Regions:
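C-terminal regulatory
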Residues: 107-109, 119-239, 266-267
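Short helix-loop hinge/linker segments at domain boundaries
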Residues: 25-28, 35, 46-68
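Short amphipathic alpha-helical coupling segments at ligand-binding clamshell hinges
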Residues: 77, 212, 248-262
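Helix-turn-helix DNA-binding motif, specifically the short coil turn and the N-cap/start of the second
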Residues: 1-4, 8
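Conserved amphipathic alpha-helical core elements
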Residues: 12-13, 225
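A short LG(V/I)-centered, amphipathic sequence patch enriched
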Residues: 13-30
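Central regulatory/effector-binding core of bacterial HTH transcription factors
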Residues: 62-125
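A bilobed periplasmic-binding-protein/Venus flytrap-type ligand-binding module shared by bacterial periplasmic
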Residues: 239-248
Length: 267
């Protein structure tokens, strides 16, 4: 019951000699001491979990794996991979969250995050999964109607589909010409925080989208989308699997990371 939990928390705070929570009549939140204590507990539990798995050697993988990934990669690649992985390891449970926002893996308790680089967060360890170019894409019917750009500045006259991440729409697209890297501001009548939505709109002929190769490879091959300005595209984008630093990885997480890297490289 709530009263039992309250008493237990008060006893814990008394024993530690620190206030772990801020309490109001309507909310309960962690203090800085509480956040540090929670992270230490999470790390300890993860290390104990890894130690127990280590004792079982090569026995069946067990336990929960929490993963977050981008919408496009999650739907196109990660979901089929998880289906196959769980068929091979039936005692594992996967908790998957798809979002194009950058989440705090530590605070939100994720084991693995799938992100594109660069990765400025030193609190994370990372493993490179794949490198690939980006493409300026639209449906062939859109290009036929509005014309195919021959230089990035031509995008100013096109309806560009914008990814809106955490309230900060990505209106600036990067390009390169010879040794020069430059940016072009683009705009259009549609923004979304889900890359899959942008892809769907582009296939429907609504406008131009900037996508990573691994997100639209099948669409390009099938002719649903057509790329332009490939000669101006900037450096390839890295796709990483990241996990919190400073904690031992449970064997189930390590095995999944290795299998995912092999799967992505093979595909």
């Amino acid at each position: 019951s709530p009263s039992t939990v309250t008493v237990a928390l008060q006893k814990l705070e008394s024993r530690l000699g620190a206030q772990l929570f801020r309490r109001t009549t309507r909310s309960l939140s962690l203090t800085p001491d509480g956040e540090r204590f929670l992270e230490t507990c999470r790390r300890t539990i993860a290390e104990l979990d890894a130690a127990m798995e280590g004792l079982t050697g090569h026995g069946p993988l067990r336990g929960r794996i929490r993963i977050t990934a981008t919408n496009d990669f999650g739907r196109a690649t990660l979901c089929p991979f998880i289906h196959t992985f769980l068929a091979q390891h039936p005692d594992v449970v996967v908790d998957l969250l798809l979002t194009d926002d950058i989440l705090d893996l530590v605070d939100e308790g994720f084991d693995i995050g799938i992100r594109t680089g660069p990765l400025p967060d030193s609190a994370l360890h990372f493993r490179l999964l794949v490198r690939g170019p980006r493409h300026i894409c639209a449906a062939p019917a859109y290009w036929d109607e509005h014309g195919r750009p021959t230089h990035p500045r031509d995008l100013a006259s096109h309806n560009c589909l914008i990814l809106g991440r955490s309230g900060a729409p990505l209106h600036t697209w990067r390009f390169q010409s010879a040794d020069e890297t430059f940016s072009i501001r683009v705009d259009g009548d549609r923004l979304a925080n889900d890359g899959e939505v942008l892809r769907t709109w582009a296939i429907a002929g609504a406008g131009v989208v900037l996508k990573s190769r691994w997100d639209v490879a099948d669409d390009l091959a099938a002719g649903r989308l057509e790329s332009c300005l490939d000669a101006f595209m900037a450096d390839p984008v890295n796709l990483y699997a990241v996990h919190p630093a400073g904690r031992a990885l449970p064997r189930r997480v390590e095995v999944m990371l290795t299998a995912l890297a092999d799967h992505v490289t093979g595909s």
